[in-house]
Curated annotation (Swiss-Prot):
Keywords: ATP-binding, Endoplasmic reticulum, Golgi apparatus, Ligase, Membrane, Nucleotide-binding, Transferase, Ubl conjugation pathway. The keyword DNA-binding does not apply. The active site is at 748 (glycyl thioester intermediate). Residues 495-509 have a biased composition (Polar residues). It catalyses: S-ubiquitinyl-[E1 ubiquitin-activating enzyme]-L-cysteine + [E2 ubiquitin-conjugating enzyme]-L-cysteine = [E1 ubiquitin-activating enzyme]-L-cysteine + S-ubiquitinyl-[E2 ubiquitin-conjugating enzyme]-L-cysteine. GO terms for molecular function: ATP binding; ligase activity; ubiquitin conjugating enzyme activity. This is Probable ubiquitin-conjugating enzyme E2 24. E2 ubiquitin-protein ligase that mediates E1-dependent protein ubiquitination. Mediates PHO1 degradation through multivesicular body-mediated vacuolar proteolysis in response to inorganic phosphate (Pi) availability. Negatively regulates the protein abundance of PHF1 and PHT1s under Pi-sufficient conditions by facilitating the degradation of PHT1 proteins at the endomembrane. Functions cooperatively with NLA to regulate the abundance of the inorganic phosphate (Pi) transporters PHT1-1, PHT1-2 and PHT1-3 in different subcellular compartments.
């Protein structure tokens, strides 16, 4: 309802507003206008502060914001500019961050060098220089004893900087302690107020990470954790690109004439000035002649970057707002100057550097370097260029350098051989123990990667020099290797060391070593062989068994079957959810069979008494003749020999003393459930001698990149089963074809408690079963779009970047499935030899037809539709498939498949 104001109402309102304005004017003593104008300006400043400015680091992978599904690139250079505001409200704009300095020369997490050792700064004890109000100057080592107490307001609410230049402090010292150095005047107890002039690192706690050690002295003792900063050398870093909003800094050489004064200072500056008035009288006369650099806070950032795109082109001065970060890097994406090797070969003398990448066609132009032995000249490097498929490349395992990596220069080969004759070894030892070797040599041998150029690595060394080296001349220090060095925290240790520092300007530290320079870690490396996320690495986490996600996933992909996590195997529930999925899976598979001459996949049931003694063990791996006079492999059976089972010798296996009646009964129930409800695409063998061991074979479902493949799993039931989930090992053959299935055989699934989960996602002793587990493998793990199984990747569903990566993942998954077929035919798992031969005898023609269809452009997983777009599949995929096709023909021919009429697809 609208309200209209009469003239009298308006006059009354105006009078009221006028009186209120006068009241405010009176209350604020004539400063109301100034405050209100400052308030408006402050709101504008807050909006500016909260404005989003996208930032990047060296080596980040990015895409163009205007073409998110296009090629990606790598950030190779950064220019950063910031707006600064001093504590007095004065501002500077568009300041290059290369001019900025931190409040201390050493900060937490910085890498430092002491002789051959590299460490990371873990804690800092500050040395503060204070000027008292009467002009007396002194330094104090602040070791947590409240020798200096900050007087409010404290401008820096940052735990990393307890003190900063210009800060007012109260000195709480009854006498001049050992850690105090008087620069001017003498100590008098009445001098308690002062101003901080400089703040530096007085003592540093270092966590020693690694060392360059000699071959004969692996027990080299690490330096003490508590160090004098003068004995340390700071490792170079690209700190100019790491500044953020709100960071405090110092601008060397800044003067009042360089600073633009605001016409009307903002509220924050006004308040700070009011607070500073309490100590300006004593501080100003010192500031005028002290030449102290003024303290600034960063209020705005702006970044320009240079990007090296996959096709080899370079864009300079790109505004960061025009780029998007690539959160999930495709495993088959490569970038110029990246070092690679061929997947299928183990030739350590052949490595390549990427020159250009066609992201759409998945092809890579590689410059190969091959070491060739020649009698006349010895070892010679031969260089050649080749365009290859991205699917046949891997990042070089030893040359995976990234920006800011800490690297060590290795001695030239043959410089020192511990097995050489005594004369040579003695000469080398004499060389390595010279005094300059323990000092300058290490500073010129430890550095940080700053770039890549023409197959070389650009390194900035600790001595300040920069050079380009071949990747084989340096070794990367893994930052995940941290030591458990003891941290000296006692007050006495700090005081003792500070006394030594005051007595001597330099700390002597001589380490004499002999032998070949190597990288040596103090601590133990991580047990999990999962590398840290960088610009070159694909993230290695795998998603768990997420039922709700699976439902939406299959709904999106057009699947007709949905698994229920509440599967029951009790006798009272004849029509369980598991049985429904079995029936649907079997129908889906049977409906996909188009060849009338193929095997009838109707399940043949074998009756097993509850005790498990009624199985005819003589029929192990026998073939049953069906109505078409064809033979097939039993779905479920018992075997005697399980000598090649992965868990046979496991220390977590079942001891005879641990066998209980309840456990045996539960296992027999599992056997009965498997016998009665296995779909015709799953085969299981249990071991008579070891009831806790099973082996299962799964057939890849139609419509997935795993179609027609065979996938084997070894299963062990722990003594606590079913209160603990079974242990599972996947027969990978050293290949990774799914985010949940690792090359090592590890299966990452929340249902197995090998991945995080909750509720129905995890193992339930009352409802979960082996059958449910196998169905989960087949329906949820080996699914239509396995790319989205990766943890967090479900957020990319429906997005251009995610769908593009999913297509690439499916192409590679099918290629690996074909490789696993070849491997399985030549070395099938025990007791499944006949299954492997029988399966591929009847499915070989279908596999070969699918390969031809994919070569013609049919999307992977939909080979039934022979009308495909020739541009659907990438050229890199077709290159690899054309190489695999003859190998498939050969492998199928070896088991008696007639492949004479099959003609390999054109490259």
């Amino acid at each position: 309802m609208e309200m209209s104001l009469t003239d009298s109402d308006w006059d009354s309102s105006s009078d009221s507003g006028s009186s209120e304005h006068e009241e405010v004017e009176f209350s604020y003593g004539g400063r109301a206008q100034n405050i209100f104008s400052n308030l408006e300006e402050t709101i504008g400043k807050i909006d500016e502060f909260l404005s989003f400015e996208r930032g990047f680091m060296y080596g980040d992978i990015v895409r163009s914001a205007t073409e998110p599904s296009g090629q990606s690139g790598r950030v190779i250079n950064i220019d950063m500019f910031v707006n600064l505001e001093s504590t007095h409200g004065k501002i500077m704009k568009e300041v290059d961050t290369k001019r900025l300095q931190k409040l201390r020369s050493i900060s937490l997490s910085d890498y430092v060098i002491n002789g051959p050792w590299v460490g990371r700064v873990d804690k800092i004890v500050e040395r503060v220089s204070v000027t008292l109000d009467d002009g007396t100057n002194y330094e104090v080592l602040v070791d947590g004893q409240d020798k200096l107490v900050a007087i409010p307001p404290n401008l820096l609410e940052d735990s990393q900087y307890s003190y900063y230049p210009g800060q007012r402090v109260q000195v709480k010292l009854a006498h001049a302690p050992r850690s105090t150095t008087w620069l001017c005047g003498t100590w008098r107890g009445t001098q308690v107020m002062g101003t901080v002039c400089t703040v530096e690192a007085g003592l540093v706690y270092v966590d020693w990470v690694a060392s360059i050690v000699m071959e004969g002295d692996r027990n080299l003792t690490a330096p003490q954790a508590l160090q004098n900063p003068e004995s340390l050398t700071l490792l170079p870093c690209v700190s100019h690109a790491s500044w953020q909003l709100g960071d405090w800094c110092i601008l060397p050489g800044s003067s009042h004439c360089d600073i633009a004064e605001r016409q009307t200072p903002n509220v924050a500056a006004y308040n700070l000035n009011e607070c500073h008035k309490t100590f300006q009288k004593g501080f100003n006369r010192n500031m005028q002649n002290s030449g102290l650099d003024e303290l600034f806070v960063i209020t705005k950032t702006k970044m320009k970057v240079a990007v090296m795109w996959q096709d080899g082109s370079c864009s300079l001065g790109v505004d960061s707002q025009q780029l998007l970060p690539v959160g999930a890097v495709n495993a088959h994406d490569f970038w110029p100057e990246q070092f690679v090797v061929e997947k299928e070969t183990c030739n350590s003398k052949k490595w390549g550097v990427v020159k250009a990448v066609n992201a759409k066609e998945q092809t890579v132009k590689v410059q190969w370097t091959i070491q060739v032995e020649k009698e006349a000249t010895g070892c010679v490097d031969e260089v050649m260029e080749e365009i290859v498929s991205a699917y046949e490349l891997l990042e070089h395992p030893d040359f995976g350098f990234c920006f800011s990596d800490v690297v060590v220069k290795l001695l030239p080969e043959g410089k020192f051989d511990p097995n050489a004759d005594t004369i040579v070894a003695t000469e080398a030892k004499h060389l390595l123990t010279e005094s300059d070797y323990s000092g300058a040599y290490f500073l010129s041998s430890i550095g940080v990667v700053t770039g890549f150029k023409n197959g070389s690595v650009k390194v900035k060394w600790a001595n300040g020099s920069t050079s380009k080296v071949a990747p084989c001349e340096i070794w990367k220090m893994e930052r995940s290797e941290y030591s458990n060095s003891s941290t000296v925290s006692s007050e006495g240790s700090v005081q003792d060391l500070s006394q030594k520092i005051s007595q001597s300007d330099e700390a002597s530290s001589n380490h004499q070593e002999t032998g070949l320079v190597k990288l040596y870690s103090v601590g133990e490396s991580c047990n999990e062989n999962i590398p840290e996320c960088s610009s070159f690495f694909l993230p290695k986490a795998a998603i768990g068994f997420i039922t709700n996600l699976a439902s939406s996933l299959f709904g999106y992909q057009g699947s007709t079957s949905v698994i229920s996590s509440h599967s029951r195997c009790n006798d009272s529930e004849d029509q369980s959810d598991s049985e429904v999925l079995v029936q649907e899976t079997a129908e889906s598979y049977d409906n996909s069979e188009t060849n009338s001459g193929e095997v009838d996949m109707t399940t043949t049931m074998v009756n097993i008494p509850i005790e498990g003694k009624g199985i005819n063990k003589t029929l192990d791996s026998t073939l049953l003749e069906n109505s078409r006079n064809q033979v097939r492999f039993r779905q479920f059976d018992m075997v005697n020999d399980c000598s090649d089972h992965h868990f046979l010798s496991s220390d977590k296996g079942l001891a005879q003393s641990q066998v209980t009646k309840s456990w045996v009964k539960k296992v027999q129930q599992e056997w009965s459930n498997l016998e009665a409800n296995l779909p015709n695409t799953i085969y299981v063998r249990v071991c008579e001698e070891r009831m806790d061991l099973l082996r299962a074979a799964l057939v890849g479902a139609p419509g997935t990149p795993y179609h027609d493949g065979l996938f084997f799993f070894d299963i062990m039931l722990p003594p606590q089963y079913p209160h603990e989930p079974p242990m599972v090992h996947y027969h990978s053959g050293g290949m990774r074809l799914n985010p949940n299935l690792y090359e090592s055989g590890r299966v990452c699934l929340s249902l197995l408690n090998t991945w995080s989960g909750s509720g129905t996602e995890v193992w339930n002793a009352g409802s979960s079963s082996i059958l449910q587990l196998l169905l989960s493998f087949q329906a949820l793990v080996l699914n239509e779009k396995p790319y989205f199984n990766e943890a967090g990747y479900d957020k990319q569903l429906g997005r251009a970047e995610g769908e593009k990566n999913s297509v690439s993942y499916n192409e590679n998954a099918f290629l690996i499935t074909c490789k696993s077929m070849i491997s399985m035919l030549r070395k099938p798992p025990k007791h499944f030899e006949m299954l492997v031969k029988d399966h591929f005898t009847h499915r070989a023609q279908h596999v070969l037809a699918a390969c031809k269809a994919y070569m013609e452009g049919v999307p992977v997983g939909s080979s039934a539709n022979l009308q495909g777009n020739s541009t659907t599949n990438s050229t890199g995929f077709k290159i690899m498939l054309s190489k695999l096709y003859p190998k498939l023909l050969e492998a199928f021919s070896e088991i008696g498949v007639d492949c004479v009429q099959e003609i390999g697809p054109e490259s």
